Amino acid sequence: IHHVKTYTLDVLKYKNIFDYIITKTWLSRSRDEKSIPWHIHACAHISFVYYLNTPPKSHKLKFMNPHHKNSLWLGNKEGKYDHLKMIEEHNEINAETFFLHPPEGHIALFPSTLHHSTESIDGFVGERLAIVGDITCVLKKEYLQFSTGFISPQHWKIYQG
């Protein structure tokens, strides 16, 4: 949770008003050249990937820029027809996607509603292993007066259906 607090407080610049609940985790295993399609984690606030094993040419983690604020024309995507595009060099300012090649032992933290996927790389051999999970931010007890934000499940009343 230390990294999540650092991300929330120092990177995103939120106030220190949250407790953090890991709501689910799973093991991600990639053994072939199949990619994971674009998706979000709608039931969480922060998602994480902790890379246990990253062989050479293992999948890259891709993120989609949902705003395209610096795109002058639609259709200037990165891809196999780059020679037909108007952009000299894709970077974090003009690209609609960006990616990471996370090293072993790296943890990636990102907003759960940020579209993301994985993309395989030709020649990948081996198995990429990662622990993946979702975190929900809940208001600390002394900050329940905020009109938005989740309250801790300890204050919930659950009715069995």
Regions found by a protein language model. Name each.
Residues 1-34, 38-41:
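Signature of the catalytic double-stranded beta-helix
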Residues 1-4, 151-161:
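Surface/interface-facing alpha-helical segments and adjacent flexible terminal/loop regions used
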Residues 7, 14, 20, 50-51, ...:
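Sequence-level detector for tyrosine residue identity
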Residues 15, 20-21, 54-56, 124:
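A generic structural signal for short, non-catalytic loop/turn and secondary-structure boundary residues
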Residues 30-109, 119, 126-127, 131, ...:
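Catalytic core of non-heme Fe(II) oxygenases with the double-stranded beta-helix
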Residues 116:
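Glycine-rich nucleotide phosphate-binding loop and flanking beta-alpha elements
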